[in-house]
Amino acid sequence: MKIPLLGGYSKRRSVNQDAQRTVNLYLETDTAEPESGSALYMVPGKTEFAAIGNGPIRAMISHNHLVIAISENGVYRINETGAGTRIGTITLDGTKRVALSANRNHVIAVTGQNAYIITGSSVTSVTDTDFAGSYLVDYLDGYFVFAIPDSQQFYISAINDGSSFDALDFAQAESNLDDIVGLVVDHRELWLFGSKSIEIWYNSGATDFPLARRDGAVLEVGCAAPQSISKADNTIFWLGRNAHGQGLVYRADQYNPQIISNRGIEYEIGQMPDIGKATAFAYQQSGHTFYVLSFPESMRTYVYDASIQDPELAWHVRETYAQGRDRANCHVFAFGKHL
């Protein structure tokens, strides 16, 4: 009888059921010989590439051969040598949330009631009075898409211009009563996440308002943490919530929510005091696509390997000696490096 000694993070409440903790190691299996052809590899470490600002890195994006990074309230550009230059300042509210998106011409940052246009050399406040505030932004077919906080309404910028708005360019996600808490564009479709449901919209080309709801594309699962939404492996991942509870991790299988968390991780998430502050990013390395889900309040980081189908094997945790959780808040691939 072969005893499987290698696996993922699947610790249960009862160690008699499962006691396995896979920490800073990820599993790689041979599909031809899954029982004998498995190995655990160490998660690569981190080295300093650039030193900017005094606060945590809140967001990063690659744009026009530079990285634009937000450190506390400072905006920096970073070049391929790691040299960082402060190019401006933004105003953060109490949540200190920042979201970035970009078109060919510029990056836009939103912080709640404020928005900023960022180039490689300047930061300019958006002054158009029709900007209605947002913590969320993404790019679709020339438009930036935003969601009005604490509402079901979303709106778009002028085409190819994140500083210009029309008060009539808005719509409402109304298939359910939940407010929009997250949004992401995937395969040229706009996914609007509520706390209990998801609506999917697309560019219909209509002249009055270009976006329209996709018929029948409503998911009865919402989002528990807006910053847990991340694209990877040709799909979307997020920490879920619906009318019956919360704390399951999902990936989209076309328009179907597929649970990818295992019972051990779901139990641990359920014991956390505030999962709404969870953050996530995704990256690909050595043939593995990793979804990195962190809970800053509880100092925990869980990582899902999309190359493994079995949730009992696909997860591991990452820990840092000084912090408990993984140190990374966000990620961008630039200059041939994972930053």
Where are these regions (language model features)?
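A broadly used, surface-exposed interaction patch
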Residues: 79-109
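Hydrophobic or amphipathic alpha-helical targeting/insertion segments
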Residues: 99-131, 136-138, 145-146
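Short loop/turn positions that demarcate and connect the beta-strands within blades
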Residues: 54, 92-94, 129-132, 175-178, ...
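Short, surface-exposed terminal/edge motifs of secreted or surface/virion proteins that either
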Residues: 72-80, 114-124, 156-158, 240, ...
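N-terminal beta-propeller domains
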Residues: 1-85, 133-195, 199-201, 205-206, ...
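Glycine-centered tight turns/hairpins at beta-strand boundaries that repeat
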Residues: 72, 110-112, 149, 233, ...
